[in-house]
């Protein structure tokens, strides 16, 4: 969430910056609420001061042998008024906080201003798409012909947007995840982390999935008097980032770099009719997540680093891609700046997103109360959090199948993956 003080003191500037991402801040309503908050705050403080002063006079009156019943009654009356004002103030603050929790992050000044994905800006391109001398097939036809992708039985078992993988295609999928983990842990300095796949509501609030995006989650256990509800993770960003929730990290420990390979679960509530065939958009998919917990002074460089780490996977697999910086109107709810990496898919004759790398700055940290202790003044301050896909395994599988297809329907195994495939060089 945004800094409440900044939101109050710079309301017009905040509204202007949020408007660039298509979010209309109700300035009039917030102004009225803030005026009411100030009035209640002053009234509460005045009542508290009056009660304290009169309470102090009780002892003095008793020392003089005077009757204190009227003073005691006055203190009781002030106490009741004070309790009422405190309750009213608490309710108002909860209302303001609820609004603040629904406000997206401020875009970084370096993010291009735009309305939607058409205004995203390409920053670099790597590799040249292969020119095939035969008619290319998509991953669905190739995978089904190899008996490696089974959509029919997945629908029978679970419904649409699920997949069963078998044989060498399943092995290739597993190899991709292992390859990514090994690269990030041995070359890029991330610590491999095993995380829960079920998380509580506080964790989802911390990273910003709640309250705004609850419909995209699979809720497995409702909240009860005995405890919070549990939901399947939409991304390992949630448990990895929440690792530092309610913590004060020593500045010398920064940056903290964590990675995890997990299944991810999304209802895709807003994706009706999009990518209904194939492995591009599933309810359950594997992803290697990269998370960095960084010093505020270094988080923009960390964003460049995390993006390059995701790009390295595609370079080693020799898969052509382009990197886009998202415009303000296309960024995610909690992001201040985002790079999307798009891989070339020959069957679609276009680039498709395979990774999204974002700097959340202190947006998540404020929700989580994740802080570091500064060496300069020994005081706690909010951390910056970053995350990125390194990569989405299923989409990488699609890219490998399509880019490495042969005329006879076989798939050449990329050299970087052969050690993970027992030396196998050809599928089919």
UniProtKB/Swiss-Prot annotation:
Residues in coiled coil: none
Pfam families, alphabetized: Seryl_tRNA_N, tRNA-synt_2b
UniProt KW Ribonucleoprotein keyword: no
Keywords: Aminoacyl-tRNA synthetase, ATP-binding, Cytoplasm, Ligase, Nucleotide-binding, Protein biosynthesis
Localization annotation: Cytoplasm
Binding-site residues for L-serine, renumbered to this chain: 235-237, 289, 389
EC number: 6.1.1.11
GO biological process, alphabetically ordered: selenocysteine biosynthetic process; seryl-tRNA aminoacylation
Enzyme class: ligase
Cited CDD domains: SerRS_core (cd00770)
Alphabetized GO MF terms: ATP binding; serine-tRNA ligase activity
One CC-aspect GO term: cytoplasm
Pathway per the UniProt entry: Aminoacyl-tRNA biosynthesis; selenocysteinyl-tRNA(Sec) biosynthesis; L-seryl-tRNA(Sec) from L-serine and tRNA(Sec): step 1/1
Catalysed reaction, written as an equation: tRNA(Ser) + L-serine + ATP = L-seryl-tRNA(Ser) + AMP + diphosphate + H(+); tRNA(Sec) + L-serine + ATP = L-seryl-tRNA(Sec) + AMP + diphosphate + H(+)
Record-listed ATP binding positions: 266-268, 353-356
Record-stated family: Belongs to the class-II aminoacyl-tRNA synthetase family. Type-1 seryl-tRNA synthetase subfamily.
Domain note: Consists of two distinct domains, a catalytic core and a N-terminal extension that is involved in tRNA binding.
Annotated function: Catalyzes the attachment of serine to tRNA(Ser). Is also able to aminoacylate tRNA(Sec) with serine, to form the misacylated tRNA L-seryl-tRNA(Sec), which will be further converted into selenocysteinyl-tRNA(Sec).
HAMAP family: Ser_tRNA_synth_type1
PANTHER family xrefs: SERINE--TRNA LIGASE (PTHR43697:SF1), SERYL-TRNA SYNTHETASE (PTHR43697)
Subunit comment: Homodimer. The tRNA molecule binds across the dimer.
Protein name: Serine--tRNA ligase
Encoding gene, per UniProt annotation: serS
